[in-house]
C-alpha cells in the first residue's frame, strides 16, 4: 500500500531534519519550539475562545514569501508542543519529501496530508525505540507485569508517557497503536471512553505534578522587542500602531538599559591576562 510506503520513509525524513541540529537527546519535547523558530516566523499568542491550536500560512514580506506559524498559547503546553511539531511538518514540506523518496506521482488530498503530517509529528516527538523502552520502564515502575491490567493503572502509564515526551493524551494513544504496544481494538476502546479517561488523565497528571496542563499565555514573536526598538528609533510606524503592537504583545519599556558598567573578566580563553 502507498500509505505503508509513505510511513516507512518518515524516519529517514526525520533524520534529514535532525542532521541540521546537534540533538543529543532523541526526546525533543519543548525543544521543538526552537527548531520551528529556525525555519519560520512563529507567533505565540493566546486566543481563549479558539478551538484551533495553531496553523501555518505564508505571507509576502518585501516581495518574498515567508512562512508564518501561529501557536495558540491558551492551550496546554502539551498541545502546543504537538502543534509545533505538526506545523514544522508543513513548513519543512514533509509531505513532498516523503512522496519524493518513494518516487510516486500521487497527489495527497488535504485530509491525507494532515494525517501524514500528524504521523511525522508523532515519530519526531516519540521515536519508536525510546517510546517502547519508556513504556516498559513505566510499567515496571508501577509493578505491572501482567498483560491484563486495570484501566486505571494503564492510564497512569499513559500519563507517564505523556510526561516523558510532553505530548497530549490522544497523541500517546495513537502512538501506542502505531508502535504495536496495544491493539487497534484496545485503541478504539480508549477512544470510545474518552470523557471518563480524560478525567483520569487530569487527576493523574496533577498527582504526578506534571506541567502538561500548564497554559503559558505567552504573547511574543521571537526578536519582536529588538524589532520594535528599531522601528521606534527609525520612526518607521505611526505612534498609534506602535503603541497597539506594544499593548497586544505586552512589551513594556525597560529603563536604564543604556547604562554603561565596568565588568572585570578573568583569564581569557587563550590564557592571556
Language-model regions, residue ranges each:
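Active-site hotspot residues in diverse enzymes, especially metal/ion-binding acidic/histidine motifs
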Residues: 1-273
